[in-house]
Design a protein with these regions (language model features):
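P-loop NTPase Walker
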Residues: 1-83
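Conserved catalytic network of the ASCE P-loop NTPase/AAA+ motor domain
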Residues: 8, 36, 123-124, 149-152
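Conserved helicase motor core of SF1/SF2 NTP-dependent helicases
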Residues: 17-24, 48, 137-167
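Loop/turn-to-beta-strand initiation segments
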Residues: 40, 129-130, 153-157
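Inter-Walker segment of RecA-like/P-loop motor cores
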Residues: 62-113
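Short acidic/histidine-centered micro-motifs embedded in hydrophobic/aromatic stretches
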Residues: 76, 127, 150
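Conserved helicase/translocase P-loop NTPase motor core
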Residues: 96-129, 140-146
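Charged catalytic and DNA/RNA-contacting regions of genome-maintenance
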Residues: 134
Length: 167
């Protein structure tokens, strides 16, 4: 387990690097259980299976659903591009994912650009209190750019283990 002095609320930006089985996911659960602010914490990870596993653990620990919003990085990027189509510059056929191998990278790139430009910072700040990214070692360059841009908007902590990287 993580030592009690690891406090994800303590720093505006940070990272937790630890090997498998050391409690990174439990640290996220514990942090969300302690969260009392009105706005939820945004939690991003890479796979739908990761989202489902985290949701199950949060439910098992009776963490209030209002304390968090969980999504994959791809799902979050898609939601932002869909919600702000003019600012993202993404066409409807790309949002329809007619060619996912082409469209997902285009969406990630566009979302990284418009978050970085600051076009939606106020909307993001009004929606979320902070960001936690699980399995950060699996981020590609475009996903990393999104996370870095978000870290300029609200407090951010990334958690991962480079020895577990799958990409």
């Amino acid at each position: 387990p993580m030592p009690p002095e690891v406090d994800l609320f303590a720093a505006p930006c940070g990272s937790v690097t630890a090997p498998a089985g050391c409690g990174k996911t439990q640290l996220i659960v514990d942090t969300l259980a302690e969260h009392t602010a009105a706005k939820p914490i945004l939690v991003l990870t890479h796979t739908n299976a990761g989202v489902a596993a985290l949701r199950a653990r949060l439910a098992q620990c009776s963490v209030r659903a209002s304390a968090y919003r969980i999504s994959t990085l791809a799902g979050f990027a898609m939601r932002l591009a869909s919600r702000f189509p003019l600012r993202s510059g993404i066409s409807a056929n790309v949002l329809a994912l007619d060619d996912p191998k082409r469209d997902y990278p285009a969406i990630r790139g566009a979302v990284g650009n418009f978050i970085h430009a600051g076009d939606i910072n106020d909307a993001l700040r009004a929606t979320y209190s902070r960001l936690l990214v699980d399995e950060y070692q699996d981020c590609n360059v475009a996903q990393h750019r999104i996370v870095v841009a978000l870290s300029k908007v609200f407090p951010t902590c990334v958690l991962g283990d480079p020895m577990q990287a799958i990409f």
